[in-house]
Amino acid sequence: MNSNIEKSDKPSFIKISEQPSLYDDLEKKSVREILEDINKEDQKVAIAVQKAIPQIEKLVTQIVPRMKQGGRIFYMGAGTSGRLGVLDASEIPPTFGMPPTLIIGLIAGGDTALRNPVENAEDNTIRGWEELTEHNINDKDTVIGIAASGTTPYVIGAMHAAREHGILTGCITSNPNSPMAAEADIPIEMIVGPEYVTGSSRMKSGTGQKMILNMITTSVMIQLGRVKGNKMVNMQLSNRKLVDRGTRMIIEELGLEYDKAKALLLMHGSVKKAIDAYKAG
C-alpha cells in the first residue's frame, strides 16, 4: 500500500456535501439574513440523522457485546471530523467515569492537528493503521471512520486494514456510496445536502457528526450500565459543580441531609458507589 494516495480530478461518485450552496451572494446579505439562512439549513441536520437511526442502531448493537468483552472504540478522522472524534472520546471519562483508553480519538497529523493543519497528513494511507497497531488493536475493538466526503485516505487505509484483521468497522459520512462506506461493515450515511458556504463541512456535516457521536457513545454507555435512571451516577467529581450535582443525586435517591450526602459522596468517590454502600449498610 502506498504511503500517499494520488489525488484525482475525476471523482468516482458525486460528493453531495461539496455541491454548490443553495444560497449565493452571501457577502451581500445582512447578518440577520445569514443567521436565519444557516439556522434553516441546520434544521435539515436532525432530519438527516433521524433517517440514519437504523444504521446507528446496527452499529451500537454490534459494539456493546464487544465492549462487554473488553473491546474499545477507535474514532478516526482528519480536520473537523478528527477533532470531533477526539472531543467525543475525551468526554467519556468525566461523564461516565470510564478510563480514557476505552474510547480513543485519532486524528490525522496527531495532537498538533487539533489546533493547526498538518500538511498532507490526511493523504497518508498507512499511518492510520500504524497508529491503531500502536494501541494493540484486536478483534474485540471497533473502528469508526469519520469523514464528510467519505474519501479521506488516512481513514480509508486504516479501515481497510482493520477489516482484513477481522475488526468491526463503521463510518459516518455525508455522501452516499463513498469509498469509506465501502470499507465499513456498518456505514452511517447522513445526507445533509450542500453546505451554506460551499464545501465547508465543518457546518452541517460537522453538526450531524457530533449528534451521531453523542448518540453512539451515550447509548453504549447506558447499555453498559453507566447511567442509573437518567443520571450520570459514575461521573468524575472534578469540580465543585459536579460535587454539588452528585450530592443532590444522593439526596434524591436516599433522602439524606445535604452535608451527610456530600460526606458520603466524597468518601466513596462516585454517586453509584456512595448509594450502593449506603444501601448495603
Curated annotation (Swiss-Prot):
Record-annotated active site: 91 (proton donor), 122
UniProt record, GO biological process: amino sugar catabolic process; N-acetylmuramic acid catabolic process; peptidoglycan turnover
Domain SIS: 63-226
Record keywords, A-Z: Carbohydrate metabolism, Lyase
Catalysed reactions, as listed in the record: N-acetyl-D-muramate 6-phosphate + H2O = N-acetyl-D-glucosamine 6-phosphate + (R)-lactate
Enzyme class: lyase
Record's miscellaneous remark: A lyase-type mechanism (elimination/hydration) is suggested for the cleavage of the lactyl ether bond of MurNAc 6-phosphate, with the formation of an alpha,beta-unsaturated aldehyde intermediate with (E)-stereochemistry, followed by the syn addition of water to give product.
Function: Specifically catalyzes the cleavage of the D-lactyl ether substituent of MurNAc 6-phosphate, producing GlcNAc 6-phosphate and D-lactate.
Quaternary structure, from the entry: Homodimer.
The name this protein goes by in its record: N-acetylmuramic acid 6-phosphate etherase
Organism: Bacteroides fragilis (strain YCH46)
Lineage: Bacteria, Pseudomonadati, Bacteroidota, Bacteroidia, Bacteroidales
